[in-house]
């Protein structure tokens, strides 16, 4: 059910034209809450919307209002339920709702290695694909960011990928073995997307504005 929720949130995030960081913080809040507090399946979408609302307040200048978030749930919840869930999340997490995200590390790397636009979007495609699978939370945000950059560099034939093993890029020395292991899992996830019922990430990155990198990836 978590995978279905995150897939839906990717679609919602795109619909409202929100910042990348907002999506990653939303997923961080959801996973932190789920690890600390049991929740009924019927309330999972409410958790997702409330987490998105909290993230928007942190990351965005202009963001969806409560009535808009209620609308995207097709009226499954009312305003009072959303506010109550928002307060409960903050209480359970003790306002610890911000953490470094994979996109932040990836942005540092993409600039350091002068990724072109297609390479940059490829990495974003890989990262958002990794959000769907709960098993990927065993890796830190820095590992995901570096590993996605590693996959991009290998995929595109950028030979200086070995520089990623140095702590000079992200101020953290990540073992080569860990990067390669995470990269293999990311490749496996992306490969399986074409046959998955969870389509939001693949559909998003099949759009011209993202240079159709999902299709480019499948064709190469």
Each language-model region and where it sits:
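Acidic, serine/threonine-rich low-complexity regulatory regions at protein termini
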Residues: 1-49, 53-220
């Amino acid at each position: 059910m978590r995978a279905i929720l995150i897939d839906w949130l990717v679609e919602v995030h795109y619909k409202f034209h929100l910042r990348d960081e907002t999506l990653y913080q939303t997923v961080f809040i959801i996973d932190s809450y789920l690890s600390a507090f049991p929740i009924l399946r019927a309330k999972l979408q409410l958790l997702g919307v409330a987490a998105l609302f909290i993230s928007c307040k942190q990351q965005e200048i202009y963001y969806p209002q409560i009535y808009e978030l209620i609308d995207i749930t097709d009226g499954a919840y009312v305003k009072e339920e959303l506010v109550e869930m928002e307060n409960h999340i903050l209480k359970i997490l003790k306002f610890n709702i911000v953490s470094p995200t994979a996109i932040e590390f990836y942005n540092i790397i993409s600039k350091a290695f002068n990724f072109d636009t297609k390479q940059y979007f490829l990495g974003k495609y890989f990262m958002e694909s990794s959000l769907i699978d709960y098993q990927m939370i065993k890796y830190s945000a820095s590992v995901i960011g570096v590993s996605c950059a590693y996959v991009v560099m290998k995929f595109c034939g950028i030979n200086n990928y070995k520089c990623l093993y140095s702590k000079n890029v992200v101020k953290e020395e990540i073992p080569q073995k860990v990067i390669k292991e995470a990269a293999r899992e990311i490749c496996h996830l992306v490969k399986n997307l074409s046959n998955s019922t969870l389509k939001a990430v693949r559909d998003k990155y099949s759009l011209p504005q993202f240079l159709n990198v999902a299709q480019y990836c499948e064709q190469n």
